[in-house]
Amino acid sequence: MKRNALVFIAVLLFLAFFAWAGWANLNHRSQAARCLLASTAPRGLGSANGGAARYVSPLQGKPAPAFTLEDLSGKKVSLADYKGKALVLNFWATWCAPCRIETPWLIDLRNRYAAQGFEVLAISADDLDRRNPTRLSSEKRQIARFVQQMQMPYPVLIDADSISKPYGGLDALPTSFFVDRKGTIVAAQLGLTSKAEIEANIRKALGANQ
């Protein structure tokens, strides 16, 4: 009887391991697909110049949807806190390889245009398990390590999934929305483009091209 119980427990553990492995593999593939989509041409993309697709968001010309998120310290940060500034709302994740390429460009451009009233809000799309405080703390530390490693000087917010719907679903990463001083989205970029294109859209948000 005791031996049967041990065998039963062993089978349960075996099945639990494979269930976890299957979930982890599916999650990894889902993350990879979101980055892979960045180099394809989904709906809303116009003609490409030099291989970089130009994205036309349905939100362009409309007010940026309001939100309130937490930063890594737990402080509440709202879009309204940056009223009167030109912004890039940059949706990214620690596991996103194109985001790792793009981040140094954003850092340089932020430092270059900050004196003109420009800021980057980096909104992490990393998964957060709020039902498990231990896991949540570990996930936040992972994001914080990335931020420290990349020396990101601008605000970093978490839980992008909670605001993904009003911003069009965030089918690919990185995704950026360029917001002018009046709070209107003047441009958007889906996936990795180029530093020059990011700078051009920052200047548009600042009104430098008008």
What are these regions (language model features)?
Residues 85-87, 92-95, 127, 172, ...:
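Short pre-active-site segment immediately N-terminal to redox-active cysteine/selenocysteine motifs
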Residues 146-206:
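Thiol/disulfide oxidoreductase modules built on the thioredoxin-like
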Residues 58-61, 66-87, 110-113, 167:
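A short beta-strand-turn-helix
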Residues 83, 91-108:
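Conserved redox-active cysteine motifs that mediate thiol-disulfide chemistry
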